[in-house]
Each structure stands twice: as C-alpha cells, then as structure tokens.
Amino acid sequence: MRNNEKQELLVKEFKAILKAERFGSQGEIVDALRQSGFDNINQSKVSRMLTKFGAVRTRNAKMEMVYCLPVELGVPTVSSSLRELVMDIDYNNALVVIHTGPGAAQLIARLLDSLGKAEGILGVVAGDDTIFITPTRNIEVAELFDSVCDLFEYSV
C-alpha cells in the first residue's frame, strides 16, 4: 500500500474516532488508532492532526470532556476540490460575491484573478471567507455570475 493510501486511511479512521466522541486524551486516541492497525502513530502525530482538522475538546452527552470535530468542517484539506470550498455565490447590480469555507477565500480568489479580463473579471478582493468580484465594462454582472457558477459547478 502506498504512503498516500495509508495517509488517507489514517485520516478516515482519525475522523471516525473523533466522531465517536469518547476519547478525552491524545493518549486514548493513539491507543485507538494503534488498535485499528496504525502501529507507527504517536502522540505528537495525533496532536498535529487535531490541530490540522480543527478538533476541539467539548462535553459529550455524558458530560465528559472529549475531542471532537467542529460542526463546520470547512477546513480545506489537500484533497479538497475548490468547488467543495464554495458555500454560496450571489450577485447584485455591481458585484458577484462568493462565500467560502473559513480560510478558503484567498485560494479561490487567486484562481479567479488568474482568469483575468479575458473572462470578464476586472478585479477580485478576498477576505477570510468572502470574495468580491468586479466585472469588466464589457460584461454584465449577471453574465459574470453565470460564468462563475459554471466554473464551480454551482447551481442556483
């Protein structure tokens, strides 16, 4: 099995463990992963994974402090496609606005900026999770909206 496949299996199992909301310490998570066949896992790797996926400690139904994934899984991963990061696209008579998962706006804005004037994009401004797109003079905002929706396979 290739390293990439092993990593994907590890991530899948890690997320499943956190969804169970039974593990209160990193050591317990290490033990659970080892029981699932990931012998090379250690506490520092688990700590990095908890940070990477935005895991938090919270109280479960039994009022125990446990690790879990936040409800909003907007943290982009290496395998995330850009269309998965787009939450909403809308427009008014001046701009097209894209709402993304937290932290994804800069990445998507860079792609849009690279398309440039040939695609009717005069400029792009991005924050953490919101992008404003201004059309060029020769294109209507509704046309730009349609082309952006097509680009991200977004249906209204």
UniProtKB/Swiss-Prot annotation:
Alphabetical list of Gene3D superfamilies matching this protein: 3.30.1360.40, Winged helix-like DNA-binding domain superfamily/Winged helix DNA-binding domain
Q: What processes does the entry annotate via GO biological process terms?
A: L-arginine biosynthetic process; protein complex oligomerization; regulation of arginine biosynthetic process
Example of a GO MF term: arginine binding
UniProt-recorded name of the protein: Arginine repressor
Superkingdom of source:
Bacteria
Q: Where in the cell is it found?
A: Cytoplasm
Q: In which pathway does it act?
A: Amino-acid biosynthesis; L-arginine biosynthesis [regulation]
The record's principal subcellular location, in a coarse class, is cytoplasm
Q: Could you state one GO cellular component term attached to this entry?
A: cytoplasm
Source taxonomy: Bacteria, Pseudomonadati, Pseudomonadota, Gammaproteobacteria, Vibrionales
List keywords of the entry alphabetically: Amino-acid biosynthesis, Arginine biosynthesis, Cytoplasm, DNA-binding, Repressor, Transcription, Transcription regulation
